[in-house]
Curated annotation (Swiss-Prot):
Subunit and interaction comment: RNase P consists of a catalytic RNA moiety and about 10 protein subunits; POP1, POP4, POP5, POP7, RPP14, RPP21, RPP25, RPP30, RPP38 and RPP40. Within the RNase P complex, POP1, POP7 and RPP25 form the 'finger' subcomplex, POP5, RPP14, RPP40 and homodimeric RPP30 form the 'palm' subcomplex, and RPP21, POP4 and RPP38 form the 'wrist' subcomplex. All subunits of the RNase P complex interact with the catalytic RNA.
Family according to the record: Belongs to the eukaryotic/archaeal RNase P protein component 2 family.
Main location: nucleus
Pfam family, one: RNase_P_Rpp14
Keywords: Nucleus, RNA-binding, tRNA processing
Additional observations: This protein is produced by a bicistronic gene which also produces the HTD2 protein from an overlapping reading frame.
Residues making up the signal peptide according to the UniProt record: none
Compartment(s): Nucleus, Nucleolus
Species annotation: Homo sapiens (Human)
GO MF annotation, one: ribonuclease P activity
Name assigned to this protein: Ribonuclease P protein subunit p14
Function comment: Component of ribonuclease P, a ribonucleoprotein complex that generates mature tRNA molecules by cleaving their 5'-ends.
CC annotations in GO: multimeric ribonuclease P complex; nucleolus; nucleoplasm
InterPro entries: Pop5/Rpp14/Rnp2-like, Rnp2-like_sf
Length: 124
């Protein structure tokens, strides 16, 4: 009597994560522009507000870490607002009359993934 055929079931979870995490960096054309964490968050919110309006600017957005020296941050955004935030940051071109650009360095649904970069890995 032959053994019963094994059955396999493929399960795919599409975006089960509630939040996404973004590592971003703000670059100015002219050096010497500084922002504190509150100004940085206000810039993020105003970028979304300018592109998508008041309602979408109310998306839950948190700054988990912020470095004033490098103007870089790790952001937490609800997954449904990821594309809106990303496109808003991409299209932002100036802050208080000074030209600037956001660079999205990494994006992941897992915060741990942003802790290291395999491209900068140095093996002993």
């Amino acid at each position: 009597m032959p053994a019963p055929a094994a059955t396999y079931e493929r399960v795919v979870y599409k975006n089960p994560s509630e939040y996404h995490y973004m590592k971003v960096c703000l670059e100015f054309q002219d050096c010497g522009v500084g922002l504190n964490a509150a100004q940085f968050k206000q810039l993020l919110i105003s970028a979304v507000k300018d592109l998508f309006g008041e309602v979408d600017a109310a998306l839950p957005l948190d700054i988990l870490t912020y470095e004033e020296k490098t103007l870089s941050a790790i952001l937490r955004i609800c997954s449904s607002g990821l594309v809106k935030l990303w496109s808003s940051l991409t299209l932002l071109g100036s802050y208080k009359g000074k030209k600037c650009a956001f660079r999205v360095i990494q994006v992941s649904p897992f915060l741990l993934a942003l802790s290291g970069n395999s491209r900068e890995l140095v093996l002993d």
